[in-house]
């Protein structure tokens, strides 16, 4: 049955120069503004690829610009929109000092340039790493270290006969090209240009309506592009040490309306389960778009399962990269979701090895509709926690095995994120019961820190209090469930999280939603209680928004009967609604924060609702009725008493007290057993996690823990000869 006991900030950093936040209007009187150099591509300290789109503000007609003494004045001109814009190319690695001079006045700004192959903010890059450019239709990588290859441009079109996109040859154009009318009212031939290239050791793809007979400059984009970007994120959670492949960007719903569609293989969480790497890749790809195609009005995203995690995490931890998101079959983050994966692993092991909680009662202690959800978690994602699950690289020393290949590539999600988590210190290397694991860790100088903790967790507590299981079963379960070590071996005792893993809170690994109120959210919840995409995760994110910000005015939840696939009519309604919502926020020039503008500019359709299986019926907006139509369940930690926020990875403790169990009677022997299982007490869910701290946006992970970037650099004024 559904879980009945539920406990239902920080302002985002202002990113004035962040790529893709908005297009500026031409200045009405440039000479009244102070001289200023503005990098439009990205923050000036995070530029990559040796170039940057730059605006000069407040200048007249006689001025010069140089980069470290190299004259680049010729790159700039007053464009048709009235703004002085130019693309500075040939930036050196590291600091580049840009100086603007006009008479006795001037401005100076340092642009910090990083390689297009990364890294910038996500920390040290993993090794080994296989280049797979030829799988994406590109030439073989010119450099096996950076996996770079020349860009590929292709044209496709929609035929008047319908169907999918077809190859288009500009030298021999077909005669059956369809026409599309964009959301700006422009009717154009339905031809797109698709660009595929390498960036950040991944592979990106982007597509946009494109007339092959016309030019395109970032200060003069072709008119069919509406200036908006649609960004799909990929599903699942995987730890492959390869480039992978990007999402299909031939999205008719978006392209036909004039959107650009873009994504990177590193936004495929099923390929690369590192959300900091995903954010870095979004940032770099958007910078490339601004440099080559022009400023982005706003970016709206979509994605199911792991794709929802990518959206939630990028939106919260790097505010300004995404303005609106459409998470589908959603989760709040991958780290708190990992609690459910490992808890299920332990519960299945307990039940299958003679535990007194039988399969018939399994759902009562797991919080699920039945046993199938944990079985699915075990089959799909236990290998992602197991370092012997494989990392998908053919290069390097092969895959890890504690006994036979201790120096091999470890495929666990924590090892995939070692650049953020850091390594376990030497005093922990003997905490495994496996001699092979202990020897392997000592050989390589420490594995990645492991954040899993189940000390104090009373598995099955709600089931006990509800009378679904007995005191005998409750004691047996908690005595025997045990835990896992850093190599995913079963251990008889409970596990304490490795010291240092509390940095996951600061780094936003466990998503506190503190910055997420600056993002418009339509959560598309296909009801699915028989497998892993259980419904409570949508409501858990709502609870986190409420906890962090005191409201959830920026989040809608739309529930429907199908599980993973959004019905096309609902998908289109969500797309159009989110677009209208963001356009209204963009047009709101009144006072107030972005968060306030999101709350006050909702379209009429931007409300919570559910859709019945009757396609002809109007959506139901009585949420009590929706809860009856689509009940939602929980997780092992919710049954253990954690609030629906599901955000406590390592709980503070309280004493074990008989009175906390109501009418449940324990024998003295049972009580003694519980006391031995919980020597430090049981979880006090009313308190924050151990060593909790709020998330800090815009961290750069050039070492475990991360460093806050702070406000974007701005140019400084110069005066004198």
Predicted regions and their residues:
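Bacterial N-terminal signal peptides that target proteins for export
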Residues: 1-10
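C-terminal His-loop and adjacent cap/lid subdomain of alpha/beta-hydrolase
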Residues: 27-304, 308-721
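Bacterial signal peptide processing site
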Residues: 22-24
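C-terminal motif of bacterial Sec signal peptides marking the signal peptidase cleavage site
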Residues: 17-20
């Amino acid at each position: 049955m559904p879980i009945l006991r539920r406990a239902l900030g920080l302002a985002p950093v202002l990113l004035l120069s962040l790529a893709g936040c908005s297009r500026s209007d031409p200045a009405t009187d440039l000479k009244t503004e102070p001289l200023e150099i503005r990098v439009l591509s990205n923050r000036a300290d995070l530029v990559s690829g040796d170039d940057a789109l730059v605006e000069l503000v407040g200048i007249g007609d006689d001025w010069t610009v140089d980069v470290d003494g190299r004259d680049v004045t010729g790159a700039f001109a007053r464009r048709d929109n009235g703004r002085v814009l130019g693309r500075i190319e040939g930036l050196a690695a590291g600091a580049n000092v840009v100086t603007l001079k006009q008479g006795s006045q001037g401005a100076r700004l340092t642009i910090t340039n990083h390689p297009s192959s990364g890294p910038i903010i996500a920390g040290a890059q993993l090794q080994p790493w296989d280049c797979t450019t030829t799988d994406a239709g590109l030439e073989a990588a010119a450099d096996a270290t950076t996996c770079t290859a020349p860009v590929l441009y292709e044209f496709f079109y929609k035929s008047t006969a319908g169907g999918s996109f077809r190859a288009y040859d500009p030298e021999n154009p077909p005669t059956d090209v369809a026409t599309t009318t964009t959301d700006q009212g422009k009717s154009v031939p339905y031809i797109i240009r698709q660009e595929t290239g390498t960036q950040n050791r991944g592979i990106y793809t982007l597509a946009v309506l494109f007339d092959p007979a016309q030019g395109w400059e970032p200060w003069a984009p072709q008119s069919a592009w509406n200036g908006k970007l649609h960004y799909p994120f990929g599903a699942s959670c995987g730890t492959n040490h390869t480039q992978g492949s990007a999402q299909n960007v031939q999205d008719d719903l978006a392209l036909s309306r004039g959107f650009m569609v873009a994504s990177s293989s590193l936004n495929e969480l099923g390929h690369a389960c590192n959300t900091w790497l995903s954010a870095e890749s979004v940032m770099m790809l958007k910078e490339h778009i601004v440099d080559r195609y022009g400023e982005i009005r706003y970016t709206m995203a979509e994605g199911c399962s792991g794709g929802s995690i990518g959206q939630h995490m990028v939106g919260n931890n790097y505010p300004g990269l995404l303005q609106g998101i459409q998470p589908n079959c959603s989760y709040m983050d991958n780290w708190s979701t990992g609690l459910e994966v490992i808890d299920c692993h332990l519960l299945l092991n307990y039940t299958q090895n003679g535990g007194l909680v039988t399969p018939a009662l399994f759902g009562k202690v797991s919080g699920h509709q039945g046993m199938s959800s944990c079985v699915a978690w075990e089959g799909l994602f236990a290998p992602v926690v197991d370092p012997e699950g494989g990392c998908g690289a053919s290069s390097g020393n092969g895959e890890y095995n504690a006994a036979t290949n201790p120096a091999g590539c470890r495929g666990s999600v924590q090892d995939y994120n070692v650049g953020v988590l850091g390594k376990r210190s030497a005093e922990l290397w003997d905490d495994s019961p496996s001699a092979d694991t202990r020897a392997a860790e000592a050989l390589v100088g420490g594995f990645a820190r492991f954040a899993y903790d189940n000390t104090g967790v009373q598995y099955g507590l709600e089931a006990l209090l509800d009378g679904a299981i007995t005191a005998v079963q409750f004691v047996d379960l908690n005595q025997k469930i045990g835990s896992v070590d850093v190599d995913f071996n079963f251990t008889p005792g409970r596990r304490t999280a490795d010291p240092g893993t509390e940095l996951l809170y600061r780094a936003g690994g466990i998503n506190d939603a503190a910055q997420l109120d600056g993002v418009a959210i339509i959560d598309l919840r296909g009801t699915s209680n028989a497998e892993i995409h259980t419904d409570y995760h949508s409501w858990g994110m709502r609870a986190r928004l409420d906890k962090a910000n005191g409201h959830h005015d920026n989040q809608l939840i739309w529930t429907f009967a199908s599980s993973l696939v959004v019905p096309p009519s609902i998908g289109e309604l969500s797309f159009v609604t989110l677009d209208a919502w963001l356009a209204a926020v963009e047009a709101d020039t009144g006072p107030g924060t972005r968060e306030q503008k999101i709350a006050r500019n909702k379209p009429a359709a931007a409300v919570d609702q559910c859709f019945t299986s009757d396609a002809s019926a109007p959506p139901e907006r009585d949420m009590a009725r929706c809860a009856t139509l689509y009940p939602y369940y929980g997780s092992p930690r919710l049954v253990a008493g954690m609030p629906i926020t599901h955000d406590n990875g390592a709980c503070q403790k309280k004493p074990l007290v008989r009175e906390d169990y109501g009418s449940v009677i324990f024998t003295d022997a049972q009580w003694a057993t519980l006391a031995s299982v919980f020597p430090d007490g049981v979880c006090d869910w009313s308190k924050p996690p151990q060593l909790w701290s709020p998330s800090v946006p815009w961290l750069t992970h050039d070492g475990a823990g991360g460093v806050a970037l702070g406000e974007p650099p701005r140019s400084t004024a110069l005066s004198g000869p």
